[in-house]
From Swiss-Prot:
Gene3D superfamilies: 5' to 3' exonuclease, C-terminal subdomain, 6.20.10.30, BRCT domain, DNA ligase/mRNA capping enzyme, Helix hairpin bin, Nucleic acid-binding proteins. The active site is at K122 (n6-amp-lysine intermediate). NCBIfam families: dnlj, PRK07956.1. GO terms for cellular component: cytosol. It comes from Kineococcus radiotolerans (strain ATCC BAA-149 / DSM 14245 / SRS30216). Belongs to the NAD-dependent DNA ligase family. LigA subfamily. This is DNA ligase.
Length: 696
């Protein structure tokens, strides 16, 4: 809802307007999405009449999205990308009590004794970010990449546990809440029963069901699914202060937000271990799926001192339970050819349920792994889901063998193009199809790869679409993708109607391809399918060089100097660029209008060009991510290790051993005030003045 310009409107009238808008929007949502009517027609009409009269009396109150200016039934989810007010971090994992103890020991080293621990079951659901302004739910966003997610506000509002308005005392002006959307197991069973009855495939597990239900374009579909939600943290906020995590949970519950009834605060690691053990034994007694226990330092001041890494808070950890294991029959071993030519064997299994999912295939990684595991086609094998996610064959049940089993023989030629397979290097454990230019499998996988969220994120470009475009001959390879036209798609049955015109799905593909031309350079680099270059390396290259042209002109030594890149990735980039048709892909994309350079913010001075900065300890004015970004945006290199090549070490509270090492090596040490001066003025701003000569 747009902000109302109060002007000369009396506060009583403004508050009544806000109340009327909230009631009408709630009634519309219930009617058009939930198919329920909390108000009679007469009551609803009376509210609208009062709102219109109030806006006639005070025109300043009338906004473009007021109920008097909009049609009631226009509720749809477009999945637009939205920035999180505060980044959604992940959690580091512990898979044993030893790893949990090591984490607790690090906490004690950093903050001393006295930390208390909040324990809660780790829900296996879909992370969600809710934003409330003046107590009113204004946005619901999926986690996405932690910085940005998809707007699913209308869908979230259908979830039974999500309050549209916070109630109670001291509701904050602004509140970002983190939680998990999931299914109770009985709700999941009911959904699947309905799908089977309707002749549709059931969901594999409750988490997939939750994700699929929340990402419906029509929120009326989401409203039919019995989704639940629990909150487990807060992000950005104004008007809410708390000293403990458990105290924050109490406030959230008092305002009407659902928190877990199983949260427990304990004083010792032994009590944490007991909590973990209890839910490990009773995980299937919980009404929803859990895959571990989350342990957090309860005291907020200690959380601040501990800080965060680039991906996870240091004051929290997820203890992951051992994955479930089952036995089933290994029906066959087949191979898959990936986008870089890697040939990977996979197991074809008698379908079996493990960790809540039905598994029919599992990875075997490579031929050496098949030999190491000792599995034969026809074996009874032990299957688990590593991390409760990726199916994996552990090995055979040897005593169940009948003698009819047979060994798997790795093919010597590509199953898709017939090219002889080979190791790319003598020490390469994988065999590859060297026909990267025209192998149908590699072409298909590379085109499909561009659809991924880590690359160009192109909707309507699934694996079937990639295959159809190549089979129809409208593209020769990924280089042609961004020049597709409607005339091209007329020749692709997948994208045409019975009348021979381009379908809505085809038009959506073209629109998506057009929109995705304007992407950060790192996404373009990922999209090129250069071996070893994933999002992390691509970001480092984009930060270091800024443009594709600069990368093309760089030597292997230049590329290896980018932080986190090194000689292996540098060699892969140089080798890739040495291939003519690879450079043709870059040329085609450039000519099609794909952005090949990042625009640098010229307003930020490049005061740290060529400098390596280490920040250690907690700073009052910067989070760790903010300090790193401040260094990178000014041309510097942010490092986590102190060496003779370090230019400056910035020391905050609880700095630890890095400050001592800096002094031993003679590296200049700055406090936070010095860091700010360095950012603004460069090395000259923090240089010690020479002593003035004595007099007399």
């Amino acid at each position: 809802m747009d902000t109302v310009d109060g002007g000369d409107v009396p506060s009583e009238a403004r508050h009544r307007w806000e109340d009327l808008v909230a009631q009408i929007e709630a009634a519309r949502f219930a009617y058009y999405v939930r198919n329920s009517s909390p108000l009679s027609d007469g009551q609803y009409d009376a509210l609208e009449r009062e709102l219109r009269a109030l806006e006639e009396q005070h025109p300043q109150l009338r906004t473009p999205d007021s109920p008097t200016q909009t049609v009631g039934g226009t509720f749809s989810t477009e999945f637009t990308t939205v920035d999180h007010p505060e980044r959604m971090l992940s959690l580091d994992n512990a898979f044993s009590t030893d790893e949990l103890s090591a984490w607790a020991a690090r906490v004690e080293r950093e903050v001393g004794a006295g930390a208390r621990y909040l324990c809660e079951p780790k829900i296996d659901g879909l992370a969600i970010d809710l934003v409330y302004e003046d107590g009113r739910l204004v946005r619901g966003v999926t986690r996405g990449d932690g910085r940005t997610g998809e707007d699913v506000t209308f869908n979230v509002r259908t979830v039974e546990d999500v309050p549209h308005r916070l109630t109670g005392a001291d509701v904050p002006e602004f509140l970002e809440v983190r939680g998990e959307v999931f299914f109770h197991l009985d709700g999941f069973a009911a959904i699947n029963a309905g799908l089977v009855e309707a002749g549709k495939p059931p969901f594999a597990n409750p988490r997939n069901a939750a994700a699929g239900s929340l990402r419906q374009k029509d929120p009326r579909v989401t409203a039919t699914r019995p989704l639940r939600m629990l909150v487990h943290g807060v992000g950005a906020r104004r008007g809410m202060e708390n000293d403990t995590q458990s105290g924050a949970y109490e406030k959230l519950a008092a305002w009407g937000l659902p928190t877990s009834p199983r949260v427990k605060v304990v004083d010792t690691l032994d009590e944490v271990a007991e909590y973990v053990r209890f839910y490990g034994e009773h995980r299937h007694d919980v009404e929803h799926e859990i895959d571990g226990v989350v342990v957090k330092v309860d005291q907020v001041p200690l959380q601040r001192r501990l800080g965060s890494t680039s991906r996870a808070p240091r004051w929290a950890i997820a203890y992951k339970y051992p994955p479930e294991e089952v036995t089933t029959s290994l029906l066959d071993i087949q191979v898959n050819v990936g986008r870089t030519g890697r040939v990977t064997p996979f197991a074809v299994l008698e379908p079996v349920k493990v960790a809540g999912s039905t598994v029919a295939m599992a990875t075997l990684h490579n031929a050496s792994e098949v030999v190491r595991k000792g599995v034969l086609i026809g074996d009874t094998v032990v299957v688990r889901k590593a991390g409760d996610v990726i199916p994996e064959v552990l090995g055979p049940v040897v005593e169940s063998r009948t003698g009819a089993e047979r060994e798997f023989v790795m093919p010597t030629v590509c199953p898709e193009c017939g090219t002889p397979l080979a190791h790319q290097r003598a020490d390469d454990v994988d065999i590859r199809c060297p026909n990267s230019r025209s192998c149908p499998a590699q072409l298909r996988e590379r085109v499909f790869h561009l659809a991924g969220r880590g690359s160009f994120d192109v909707e309507a470009l699934g694996d079937k679409a990639a295959a159809a475009l190549l089979q129809a001959g409208v593209i020769a390879d990924e280089g042609d993708l961004f020049t597709l036209t409607e005339d091209d798609l007329v020749g692709v049955p997948l994208f045409t109607t019975k009348a021979g015109t381009v379908s809505a799905n085809g038009r959506r593909l073209l629109a998506n391809l057009h929109d995705r031309k304007d992407q950060p350079l790192w996404r373009v680099l990922v999209g090129l399918s250069i071996r070893h270059v994933g999002p992390t390396a691509a970001r480092a290259l984009a930060d270091r060089f800024g443009s594709m042209e600069a990368i093309e002109a760089a030597t292997a030594e230049d590329i290896a100097s980018a932080e986190g890149v090194g000689p292996t990735i540098a060699e892969a980039v140089v080798e890739w660029l040495a291939v003519d048709w690879h450079r043709d892909v870059v040329r085609k994309w450039r000519e099609a209008g794909v952005r090949m350079a990042d625009e640098r913010d010229e307003s930020t001075p490049r005061t740290l060009e060529g400098l390596t900065i280490v920040v250690t300890g907690s700073l009052s004015g910067f989070s760790r991510d903010e300090a790193k970004e401040a260094v990178l945006s000014r041309g510097g290199k942010a490092s986590s290790a102190v060496s003779k090549k370090t230019s400056f070490v910035v020391v905050g509270e609880a700095a630890g051993s890095k400050a001592d090492k800096a002094e031993q090596l003679g590296v200049p040490v700055l406090d936070e005030e010095g860091f700010v001066a360095l950012l603004e003025g460069g090395p000259d701003a923090v240089a010690r003045p020479a002593e003035e000569p004595g007099q007399g």
